[in-house]
């Protein structure tokens, strides 16, 4: 009897080992927190200038956690899934949407030869700008001057990622509105049609990428705001020179013109052109120094703004790092871009919410130092 029990235990363990070899699920995450100082903030009434200290989560990178899994189906085919949600390390609360998996929730099939097809919620394709931003679209970066447009996540997505062939790969997305209106979602919904295509070429010396994408207004299906519902054209390049990485990019946000939401004004900006450049110096295996300049120009009297920033990271281990960033944004007389990716509109307290945009023509300056751990 004892021998039978032993053989049964061995058989069960062997079966578990085979199942483990065929499929896997990985828990991963990142916690980011630090102390931030910012000057040039508006008063509650939108005038004047003030400053503050605060603990902040996500300045260097979004705090997040997730699950991803793969099942080997044989013949080079795999079933894959990913679930990912954001949260605040400072408060423990969920991301801004309040959803558990507000960043990613998808499932699909992958093939070593033919690529990967996914269905579900995903990072909008414009997040591909990240690879060409010296500060990785952190809080004070290219995202600030397009007011967070390139941080978007889209639901009801169908995407395809090709394998890399001779240095080239392509990626495409199509997000359904899930409505009888082809472009717009149901009334009150947060989903309009989205789509985009991306082509990348990579070798040991350089990398280049081009992206075209659309984000439609969920209420009317129009392209009616350069920062929330527009077409974007992007081209970026990375140059790898030993310990140095040189990065540069250009984006153009375009609407269909007419009345721009949410301002309701025919004279609000209908275009935004942004360019940036920067250098990362890998001083040691653990320490990196970064410097970058970002500039945006809008039409219809919306003005222009420039962010100057330096920073760096020091890796205490493969999973833990210290980070620091110093930045300032300079606005022309009619522009009011902040260091953070704030919504459009005047700064100050409006409808119970505080908008950090400075007074038009004023600047903001900030310093951030924090710690980040990945698992």
Pin down the residues of each PLM region.
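Gram-negative bacterial Sec-dependent N-terminal signal peptides
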Residues: 1-22
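Detector for outer-membrane/organellar transmembrane beta-barrel domains
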Residues: 190, 195-314, 325-327
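Gram-negative outer-membrane beta-barrel proteins
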Residues: 35-43, 87-93, 125-127, 178-182, ...
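Outer membrane beta-barrel
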Residues: 22-37, 52-179, 191-193, 200-204, ...
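Outer-membrane beta-barrel "beta-signal"
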Residues: 316, 359-375
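Outer-envelope beta-barrel architecture signal
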Residues: 23-29, 71, 75-79, 113-117, ...
């Amino acid at each position: 009897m004892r021998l039978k029990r032993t053989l049964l235990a061995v058989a069960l363990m062997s079966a578990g080992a085979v199942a483990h070899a065929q499929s896997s699920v990985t828990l991963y995450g990142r916690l980011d927190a630090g102390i931030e100082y910012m000057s040039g903030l508006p008063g509650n009434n939108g005038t004047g200038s003030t400053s503050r200290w605060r603990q902040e989560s996500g300045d260097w990178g979004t705090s997040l956690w997730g699950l991803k899994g793969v099942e080997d189906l044989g013949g080079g085919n795999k079933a894959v899934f990913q679930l990912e949600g954001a949260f605040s390390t400072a408060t423990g609360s969920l991301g801004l949407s309040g959803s558990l998996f507000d960043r990613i929730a998808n499932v699909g099939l992958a093939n070593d030869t033919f690529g990967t097809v996914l269905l579900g919620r995903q990072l909008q394709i414009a997040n591909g700008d990240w690879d060409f931003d010296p500060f990785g679209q952190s809080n004070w970066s290219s995202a600030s001057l397009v007011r967070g447009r390139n941080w978007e996540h889209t639901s009801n997505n169908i995407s395809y990622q090709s394998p890399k062939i001779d240095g080239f790969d392509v990626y495409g997305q199509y997000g359904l509105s899930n409505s009888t209106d082809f472009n717009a979602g149901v009334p009150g919904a947060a989903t309009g049609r989205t789509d985009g295509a991306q082509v990348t070429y990579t070798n040991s010396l350089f990398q280049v990428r081009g992206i075209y994408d659309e984000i439609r207004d969920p209420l009317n299906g129009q392209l009616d705001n350069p920062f929330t519902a527009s077409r974007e054209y992007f081209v970026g390049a990375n140059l790898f020179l030993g310990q140095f990485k040189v990065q540069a990019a250009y984006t153009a946000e375009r609407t269909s013109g007419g009345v721009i939401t949410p301002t309701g004004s025919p004279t609000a900006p209908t275009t935004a052109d942004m360019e940036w450049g920067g250098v990362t110096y890998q001083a040691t295996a653990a320490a990196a120094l970064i410097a970058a300049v970002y500039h945006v120009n809008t039409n219809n009297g919306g003005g222009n703004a420039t962010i100057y920033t330096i920073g760096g990271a020091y890796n205490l281990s493969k999973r833990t790092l210290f980070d620091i960033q110093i930045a300032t944004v300079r606005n022309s007389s009619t522009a009011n871009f902040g260091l953070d990716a704030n919504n459009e509109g005047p700064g100050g307290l409006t409808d119970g919410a505080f908008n950090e945009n400075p007074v038009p023509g004023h600047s903001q300056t900030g310093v951030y130092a924090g710690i980040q751990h990945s698992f």
